[in-house]
Amino acid sequence: MVRIFITGSSDGIGQAAAKVLSEQGHSVVLHARNADRAASAQEAVPGAEAVLVGDLSSIAETKALAEEANKLPPFDTVIHNAGIGYGATASQEITADKISAVFAVNTLAPYILTCLMHKPKARLLYMSSDSHYGGDESLRNITQSHSYGNTKLHDVMLANAFSRRWGNAIQVVSMHPGWVRTKMGGVMAPGALDRPARVLADWAIGKGDLARLKSGTFFTTSGPESAHPGADNVQKQEELLRICKEVSGVGVPGG
C-alpha cells in the first residue's frame, strides 16, 4: 500500500486519480479549499483516509495545511495538483496577502508545502501544463501577474530546483496532463479524465516506465517531453526560490 497526498482533489484530475488509487487499495489523503468541498470530496472518494482543508490562496492557510499534513503518517507520494487561472477558473483576484491569486495557488502554495511538509519518501510531482511553453522565465513582477502560463512554468522550475537540491533522494517531476474536460479545461476540451488520471495514479505508485523517470523530468500522458528551456536555468530557479521565500517567509530547508 502506498500513501499519497493530492492537493486540489475535490474535483477534476486530482479526484479522478484519487478514486483510481483508493480503489486499488492505496491510502489517499485528499485536499479541498473549504469544508463544503471537503464533504463532497469524501463522498466522491469514500475510501479516502482523510480530507484536509485549506485555501491555497492564503499564505496562512497553506502553512496550516502543511502542519495538518505533518500530523499524519509519512507520505510516499505528494502531488501538487491544485491550480486556478485557466478557462472557467481564470482569476484576476488580488488576495488578502496582496498577491495575485493565480501566483498564490499555482506557484507559492506548492513551494510552501514542499518546504514545510515532511519530504515524501519516494515521489513528488508538480502539476504543470503545456501552457508553460508560453511562460516568461524573466520572473518580472510575478507576484502581481495573473498569467497562468507563467505559473505553470514556475511549477516546472520548482520541480527542477528541488530535484537538483535533493539529488536522487526522491523522484521529483512535473507533468502536463493534457487538455481534458474538467472545470478548468472546460466542456470543449477534447480529452476525457480517464487517461491522465490513470497515468497520474500509475506514477504515484511507481508503476511501469514512469517509475524510472529521471528526477527533474517533465512528462505527459505519452511519456517524457522537453520542457521550456528556461526551466533549466539554475540562476532563475534560485531567483524564484528567493522570491517565494520573501513573499511567504518560508525558506527551503537546509538553505
From Swiss-Prot:
Question: Which residues make up the binding site for NADP(+)?
Answer: I13, R37, D55, N81, Y148, K152, V180, T182
* Superkingdom field: Eukaryota
Q: What is its EC number?
A: 1.-.-.-
Q: Name one GO biological process term.
A: cellular response to osmotic stress
SUPFAM superfamilies the record matches: NAD(P)-binding Rossmann-fold domains
Q: Name the Pfam families on file.
A: adh_short
Q: Which residues form the active site?
A: Y148 (proton donor), K152 (lowers pka of active site tyr)
Induction record: Up-regulated when grown with elevated levels of potassium chloride.
For this UniProt record, the keywords arranged alphabetically read as follows: NADP, Oxidoreductase, Stress response
A molecular function (GO) held by this record is: oxidoreductase activity
Summary of the function given for this chain in its UniProt record: Involved in osmoadaptation.
Family listed: Belongs to the short-chain dehydrogenases/reductases (SDR) family.
Q: Return the protein name.
A: Uncharacterized oxidoreductase AN7799
Its source organism is Emericella nidulans (strain FGSC A4 / ATCC 38163 / CBS 112.46 / NRRL 194 / M139)
